[in-house]
From Swiss-Prot:
Family, similarity comment: Belongs to the transketolase family.
Catalytic activity: D-sedoheptulose 7-phosphate + D-glyceraldehyde 3-phosphate = aldehydo-D-ribose 5-phosphate + D-xylulose 5-phosphate
Cofactor needs: Mg(2+); Ca(2+); Mn(2+); Co(2+)
UniProt-annotated site: Important for catalytic activity, residues: H26, H261
Annotated function: Catalyzes the reversible transfer of a two-carbon ketol group from sedoheptulose-7-phosphate to glyceraldehyde-3-phosphate, producing xylulose-5-phosphate and ribose-5-phosphate. Catalyzes the transfer of a two-carbon ketol group from a ketose donor to an aldose acceptor, via a covalent intermediate with the cofactor thiamine pyrophosphate.
Residues involved in thiamine diphosphate binding: H66, G114, P115, L116, G156, N185, H261, F439
Domain of life where this protein originates: Bacteria
This protein's name: Transketolase
Keywords noted in UniProt: Calcium, Magnesium, Metal-binding, Thiamine pyrophosphate, Transferase
Xref: InterPro entries: THDP-binding, Transketo_C/PFOR_II, Transketolase-like_C_2, Transketolase-like_Pyr-bd, Transketolase_bac-like, Transketolase_BS, Transketolase_CS, Transketolase_fam
Record-listed Mg(2+) binding positions: D155, N185, I187
Organism of origin: Haemophilus influenzae (strain ATCC 51907 / DSM 11121 / KW20 / Rd)
Length: 665
């Protein structure tokens, strides 16, 4: 029988061999954390390699994602559908083993990590989802949701500011099933961290309200095992296990040095490491008895079978809850969703109201949340401004409302966004969270990660332009909406009234292959008249809102608060005998995906005289109006003044729009 160290060495050699074959990568972290991984994955982790999506599996997150060969080795050794050939294709085009772990490639990878700090933050989201789902579905004697979230993280994750945001909230919420292993090796890319990272990490996490287990030898299996048992016993606090490790463990000349962090060890050093570890096998060769010791298939199948028996008893006692649980974790929407959302939208169109689109957003949440118990909302300390609360909101607290549906994220925009990604990845919820559009900047990378992972995360942004007024340019977005539109696989919506707002929410909920950004105003917006055909066309991203007889001479394209301005300018020009079309374009991303025939029907190529109007950066719009068109937008930062004065100052008036249009008519 192989020893624990020998089993851990299987990880080490796979890591160094794969990195060497790829001619790039990070062998140091996998080699340093191999002993911790061996104990966790063989003694504690509840998972089933033959069903990586089992609902009650433990979640494992490698926050220090550059050490990706650690998780790939673990998945391969324990029996997931990840072959030795897949490991040989590490970092190669279209392989299942990209340079950083990517969700959707190798089975068993729970989230895409690499941008440091976001993995631990995703894990906080997963732990929140587990605790909340348990609160909503578990009943006495029937704990169908009962799993841990484990995280590996390093110095880099802890230096990133997002780790403070996430770990502070995790402590406040008492996430007792969140257990983090800190790879305390004192090394980062530039060398020994003493010169730039001298925090007392244990004191820091104790201040957050975590249980901290200090001074664990990360190469002593019994110490690691004892610490993990202690962590599992603490039900009311998350746990940080501080493991003292040696980066590149086993390498005679590069262990304990940044030389092993981010580059292949080299053939000569690998030979020396094999000798030092007593590893007599060829590259990528693992003895059959080692595979047998590592395999989690039998144990995992038994664990899932035991859970299925529990769930059968639960379904017998609570058939409706059981059916709802299965629906929720599958990601399917309720059977009445389509009819209810359609009826709500039609009701809004039939009952005009001139309200701020942020208020329209709240009304949509109110209507849809009654149909969608999977909504898990929140705001970064701006609920009264973002209007994200509804009549049934139940804020989650450490010991109250553990089955609630709303998270007070505090002033943590980046943390909130990455936590929502973790909630979405866990399953069972559709998370939405809000802040001012200007402060999306803090969270940009988490929004990008949601798009990369194709998660149904709903980002809500209010106070969308100079229209917020007196707070001034620090709070007035200019380039932010355009920036969001440029993120691949993110759909951005900027609706013009309560109807488009409700449709934007509807489309975001129904979209299962990526996130959406919903952008709303502070100021009131007039409701537009629409036919049933126009109402149905809103979801296509752009549609003809007002038209003329025959071929138009000019097309106005507008979004959000500027649609009314476009309509008024069109009316003024029409009174002078001009043929003008107004296109409302709430989602450029959605419109760009439409077939060529539809796009031509909205923006005919023959009509080259076009004017775009949006209180955002002007440059974005030339793709729609052409170089000979006109854009009425922002080319500078805003000012501190009442909103009506600012719109006049920056040219958002009927007179200026008409004048610009006449330049090309």
């Amino acid at each position: 029988m192989a020893t624990r160290r020998q089993l851990a060495n299987a990880i080490r050699v796979l890591a160094m061999d794969s990195v060497q074959k790829a001619k790039s990568g990070h062998p140091g972290a996998p080699m340093g954390m191999a002993d911790i991984a061996e104990v966790l994955w063989r003694d504690f982790l509840k998972h089933n390699p033959t069903n990586p999506k089992w609902a009650d599996r433990d979640r494992f997150v490698l926050s220090n994602g550059h050490g990706s060969m650690l998780i790939y080795s673990l998945l391969h050794l324990t029996g997931y559908d990840l072959s030795i050939e897949d490991l040989k294709q590490f970092r190669q085009l279209h392989s299942k083993t990209p340079g950083h772990p990517e969700y959707g490639y190798a089975p068993g990878v729970e989230t895409t990590t690499g941008p440091l700090g976001q993995g631990i933050t995703n894990a906080v989201g997963m732990a929140i989802a587990e605790k909340t789902l348990a609160g909503q579905f578990n009943r006495e004697g029937h704990e169908i949701v009962d799993h841990h979230t484990y995280v590996f993280l390093g110095d880099g994750c802890l230096m990133e500011g997002i780790s403070h945001e996430a770990c502070s909230l995790a402590g406040t919420l008492g996430l007792g099933k969140l257990i983090a292993f800190y790879d305390d090796n004192n090394i980062s890319i530039d060398g020994h961290v003493d010169g730039w990272f001298s925090d007392d990490t244990a004191e820091r996490f104790e201040a957050y309200g975590w249980q901290v287990i200090r001074n664990v030898d990360g190469h002593d299996a019994e110490q690691i095992r004892a610490a993990t048992i202690l962590a599992q016993a603490e039900k009311g606090k998350p746990t940080l296990i501080i493991c003292k490790t040696i980066i590149g463990f086993g390498s005679p000349n590069k262990s304990g040095s940044h030389d092993s962090h981010g580059a292949p060890l080299g053939d000569e050093e690998i030979d020396l490491t094999r000798k030092a570890l007593g590893w007599e096998y060829a590259p990528f060769e693992i003895p059959a008895e080692y595979y047998a010791e590592w395999s989690a298939k039998e144990k995992g199948a038994a664990a899932e079978k035991s859970w299925e028996e529990k769930f059968a008893a639960y379904a017998k006692a609570y058939p409706e809850l059981a059916a709802e649980f299965k629906r929720r974790v599958s990601g399917e929407l309720p059977t009445n969703w389509a009819a209810e959302s359609k009826a709500f939208i039609e009701k809004l169109q039939a009952n005009p109201a001139s309200i701020a689109s942020r208020k329209a957003s709240q009304n949509a949440i109110e209507a849809y949340a009654h149909v969608l118990p999977e909504f898990l909302g929140g705001s970064a300390d701006l609920a009264s401004s973002n209007l994200t609360l509804w009549s049934g909101s139940k804020p989650i607290r450490a010991h109250e409302n553990v089955g609630g549906n709303y998270i007070n994220y505090g002033v943590r925009e980046f943390g909130m966004s990455a936590i929502m990604n973790g909630i979405a990845l866990h399953g069972g919820f559709i998370p939405y969270g809000a802040t001012f559009l200007m402060f999306y900047e803090y969270a940009h990378n988490a929004v990008r990660m949601a798009a990369l992972m194709k998660q149904r995360t709903l980002f809500v942004y209010t106070h969308d332009s100079i229209g917020l007024g007196e707070d001034g340019p620090t709070h007035q977005p200019v380039e932010q909406t355009a920036s969001l539109r440029l993120i691949p696989n993110l759909e951005t919506w900027r609706p013009c009234d309560q109807v488009e707002s409700a449709i934007a929410w509807q489309q975001a909920v129904e979209r299962q292959d990526g996130p959406s950004a919903l952008i709303f105003t502070r100021q009131n917006l007039a409701q537009m008249d629409r036919t049933s055909a126009q109402l149905d066309a809103v979801k296509r991203g752009a549609y003809v809102l007002k038209d003329c007889d025959g071929t138009p001479e000019l097309i106005f394209i507008a979004t959000g608060s500027e649609v009314e301005l476009a309509v008024q300018a069109a009316e003024a020009l029409s009174a002078e005998g001009k043929k003008v079309r107004v296109v409302s374009m709430p989602s450029t991303n959605r419109f760009d995906k439409q077939d060529a025939a539809y796009r031509e029907s909205v923006l005919p190529a023959a009509v080259t005289k076009r004017v775009a109007i949006e209180a955002g950066i002007a440059d974005f719009w030339y793709k729609y109006v052409g170089f000979n068109g006109r854009v009425i937008g922002m080319n500078s930062f805003g000012e501190s003044a009442p909103a009506d004065q600012l719109f006049k100052l920056f040219g958002f008036t009927v007179e200026n729009v008409v004048a610009k249009a006449k330049e090309i008519l």
